Swiss-Prot record:
Glycosylation sites: S68, T78, S102, S103, S104, S106, T108, S109, T111, T114, S115, S116
Superkingdom: Eukaryota
InterPro entries reported for this sequence: PIR1-like_C, Yeast_CWMannoprotein_PIR, Yeast_PIR_rpt
Gene: CIS3
Gene Ontology molecular function: structural constituent of cell wall
Alphabetized PROSITE patterns for the sequence: PIR_REPEAT_1, PIR_REPEAT_2
Annotated region described as Disordered, given as residue ranges: 78-128
Site (Covalent attachment to cell wall glycan): Q74
Function description: Component of the outer cell wall layer. Required for stability of the cell wall and for optimal growth. Required for resistance against several antifungal and cell wall-perturbing agents.
Free-text comment about domains: The PIR1/2/3 repeat is required for the covalent linkage to the cell wall.
Protein name, as recorded: Cell wall mannoprotein CIS3
Keywords: Cell wall, Cell wall biogenesis/degradation, Cleavage on pair of basic residues, Glycoprotein, Repeat, Secreted, Signal
Amino acid sequence: MQFKNVALAASVAALSATASAEGYTPGEPWSTLTPTGSISCGAAEYTTTFGIAVQAITSSKAKRDVISQIGDGQVQATSAAATDSQVQASSTATPTSSEKISSSASKTSSTNATSSSCATPSLKDSSCKNSGTLELTLKDGVLTDAKGRIGSIVANRQFQFDGPPPQAGAIYAAGWSITEDGYLALGDSDVFYQCLSGNFYNLYDQNVAEQCSAIHLEAVSLVDC
């Protein structure tokens, strides 16, 4: 098994939410904040703790560094040390153009992930964990970090952890899965975007700016080193 120099971390704020045109409303149920559709053979449950690593989407499938956590719950990528618990990922590779994207997001299916025709997700890579590593579990399509916070897409399309419940205005708080290839997926898409902001990257579920590049978020096993 190949070890990757990847570290993942996450953090969040706290509020509650419901699905509406404006996103989640505090005090309402949030587990139904899911995208339309699901990816083929995506597993909505993976109870063994895992991390996630940024993988650039290029013709050569080049690997990048893994994600780390800072204090406010945003998922980010950076080459600097994380200090505030937002989720971050360090990266030394030059972001690729969005025109070069090769995505499996269009491969949707209503097939249940537990069907005999679907393989159980296999995590191909491992990473050493440390005090700043983002540790995740997945249950019933809900992504949770080690502090019990909920992985969500908030109003500005950014990926971060909050609550529970998720913060007001959150768009999605469930519908996560792991594909047969070992990638994190949300609804019917396994493509995310890292967008440069100063010396780090914030992570989003959509391409929100020119400085964004398409990525996969690879689920990796975490080990003590």
